[in-house]
Amino acid sequence: MYKISFAGLLRGNDKDVEALAEAATTQGFLELELDCMEAKALQKDVKFLESFAESILDSPEDVKAAYHFHKTGRFRTTGFKPLGSEEGAKAGNPDGFEFFFLPQKEILLSEFREQLNCPPLAMSNIDTLTDCFKHYERTAQMLLQRLTEGLKLGNELLNAHNTSLPCVTNMGLIRYPPQPKESGNFGHIAHTDVGSLTILAATQRGLQTLDNITQKWIWVDPSDECLFVQLGDSLKFLSRGKILPSLHRVLPSDVAPEATKYTIAYFLRPNEEAEITSDDGKVWLYKDYHCRKFDAFARPLGYRPDGEESLISLRDYTGVE
């Protein structure tokens, strides 16, 4: 697995930029070493967000229902998702996670702050959450800049992620409760992320990504010294196929199935009005393509309308028992 220095990318070191470009075109994922002062701010953010995730996901059920992510905010970027409401990583089983989403647009762009619709617990922590978003945004923009340089692209990536314009970027605070073999809930279906890149931290093992060279699933071990970065569909589209999105899934931990797992996921996504061209040649506004893929996740088990097979990638149950 590629392990790339945050400090090296920040300085624009040729070796690290080349490694990032190689990871993007061969695997679609990498580990980002937190080896400088700027990166240490992210480590601090992760610790706060893990604690906040536990608190917000312990909210009463009536609060979770009132802020369901299908009816809160815009483009599925805000609110709670209940456990077991989508298809899981095992055929016929519902998923094994719940989440709370926070939107970047309403938090970082002052002209939209009054539109933020979140539970009181989130609002009482809004200053710290704002700082977290700023640190993640700077990191994501740095990665886009280095990808542009390493792959000798034009300004496609940077123009589609203009920080002064409304975007669909958000933060996911995700909880996987214990899932022993007798549990009916089972992980998260194999898929590629609809957005541009995802910056992940986790408290327990569970994430698997497909090694594109060996075509085998590999476990991703969480580490306090690294963040895991996955590249998504939108970077593939914006780079005209140069960047490879990471196919991944979440299974119950093979070493701690009785543990509760928390994942902090920063989902960098394009601006709402950015144009992307999907694999079939159709041009979309990102906000519309985003909602189409999120709706595909929520389909009933075994149901997939024509034209959606490429959206959930794919029902690969290899190695799932």
Curated annotation (Swiss-Prot):
Keywords attached to this entry: Dioxygenase, Iron, Metal-binding, Oxidoreductase
Pfam assignment, any one: 2OG-FeII_Oxy
UniProt enzyme class: oxidoreductase
Statement: the UniProt record of this protein carries the keyword Nuclease: no
Residues binding Fe cation: H191, D193, H248
Chain's role: 2-oxoglutarate-dependent dioxygenase; part of the gene cluster that mediates the biosynthesis of pneumocandins, lipohexapeptides of the echinocandin family that prevent fungal cell wall formation by non-competitive inhibition of beta-1,3-glucan synthase. The 10,12-dimethylmyristoyl side chain is synthesized by the reducing polyketide synthase gloL/GLPKS4. The thioesterase gloN/GLHYD exclusively interacts with gloL/GLPKS4 to maintain turnover of the polyketide side chain.
Protein name: 2-oxoglutarate-dependent dioxygenase gloM
Gene name in the database record: gloM
